[in-house]
Amino acid sequence: MSPKKAKKRAEGANYNVFSMFEQTQIQEFKEAFTIMDQNRDGFIDKNDLRDTFAALGRVNVKNEEIDEMLKEAPGPINFTVFLQMFGEKLKGADPEETILNAFKVFDPEGKGVLKADYIKEMLTTQAERFSKEEIDQMFAAFPPDVTGNLDYKNLVHIITHGEEKD
């Protein structure tokens, strides 16, 4: 394929990527990308991923794990590639699994519960911040147990199915 055709095909792929999402979703992805692009060079690289994991409390991430993540990208991860990768992952994704995976980032041991105080801190200080009222509503609907833990697996099930697990 000629370089001109390859460029046209890439441009067409970019158009398709942006047409997969609503404008508000693209803006949310842009926020996430900006948070991850720690050195602000327009690309997510190994150091950016390491810093992002550290910010999430995972300081001992193995190089192999980061390398595996980077191998999923067809090249350097700029915003368009980032969006394309998410588009491919989310195509046909189960909403329950998607939300569970978001919680699992904060639960590296896979316990299925998180400290309510930690969730409150994350939801009020990161990305699209929850208001005090929203936090109060969430904990009124899904109160933590007596030890202060929130069963996020049950929470996700209720969010996606409207009822508690049996």
UniProtKB/Swiss-Prot annotation:
Pfam families tied to this protein: EF-hand_7
Assigned GO CC terms: A band; cytoplasm; myofibril; myosin complex
Positions that bind Ca(2+): 37, 39, 41, 48
Location (main, coarse): cytoplasm
Signal sequence, renumbered to the chain: none
N,N,N-trimethylserine PTM positions: 2
Residue stretches making up the EF-hand domain: 24-59, 94-129, 130-165
Keywords: Calcium, Cytoplasm, Metal-binding, Methylation, Motor protein, Muscle protein, Myosin, Phosphoprotein, Repeat
A biological process term (GO) from this entry: cardiac muscle contraction
Post-translation changes: N-terminus is methylated by METTL11A/NTM1.
UniProt modified residues of type Deamidated asparagine: 14
Modified residues (Phosphothreonine): 52
List of residues that carry Phosphoserine: 19
Methyltransferase in keyword set: no
SUPFAM superfamilies according to UniProt: EF-hand (SSF47473)
Keyword Cell cycle recorded: no
Cell location: Cytoplasm, Myofibril, Sarcomere, A band
GO molecular function, one term: calcium ion binding
Cited PANTHER family: MYOSIN REGULATORY LIGHT CHAIN 2 (PTHR23049)
Quaternary structure (record): Myosin is a hexamer of 2 heavy chains and 4 light chains. Interacts with MYOC.
Other remarks in the entry: This chain binds calcium.
Function field: Contractile protein that plays a role in heart development and function. Following phosphorylation, plays a role in cross-bridge cycling kinetics and cardiac muscle contraction by increasing myosin lever arm stiffness and promoting myosin head diffusion; as a consequence of the increase in maximum contraction force and calcium sensitivity of contraction force.
Name of the protein in its database record: Myosin regulatory light chain 2, ventricular/cardiac muscle isoform
Lineage: Eukaryota, Metazoa, Chordata, Craniata, Vertebrata
